[in-house]
Amino acid sequence: SDIRFEQNDGRSTLKFLLVHGSPRSVNEYLLEDHDREDFVQLLLENDAHVMAFGHSHKPFDKVIDASRNAKLNDYRHVFNTGSVGKPKDGDVRACYVMLNVIPNPNPKLSHRYMVMPEFVRLDYDVEKAAKAVEASVLPDEFADMLRKAY
């Protein structure tokens, strides 16, 4: 399942798509080195200018120059939101994204806005969370995953 919304100022519409894994599958991993052309295709097929996803729990953002594709004439944005509860990027802190939409200074592009995700990191008591996992029915290796952020 996905969430879609738009920002419209009367002159242009910015279309957002939020998914867990990808628009194709909740279990698909979209990693930072994912093929650029496939990102463009996903955005085009889903009529989105901005796509946010998770699943891999590895935060990144990527601006895609879609003007090289004949069907698009602007830049698109994809980003992985990271993870609040189970980071896998080596940083044990919780990670979430604040999405900033600002006026676009380039009048040649079709959209009047730029999207700038801000990754926010928060400290929390990782050891307390890991011990709670160990005291539960969950496998102890999950506690180690929290401690090591993998």
Model-derived features with residue positions:
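Conserved catalytic scaffold of divalent metal-dependent phosphoesterases
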Residues: 1-50, 66
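Active-site environment of divalent metal-dependent phosphoester hydrolases
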Residues: 24-26, 51-67, 86-91
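Short gly/pro-enriched beta-turn/loop segments at secondary-structure junctions
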Residues: 11-16, 46-47, 53-56, 73-74, ...
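Active-site flanking residues adjacent to catalytic metal/cofactor-binding acidic residues
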Residues: 19, 54, 81
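Short beta-strand scaffold segments in enzyme catalytic cores
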Residues: 1-5, 58-63, 95-99
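Acidic, His/Gly-rich catalytic cores of divalent-metal-dependent hydrolytic chemistry
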Residues: 64-150
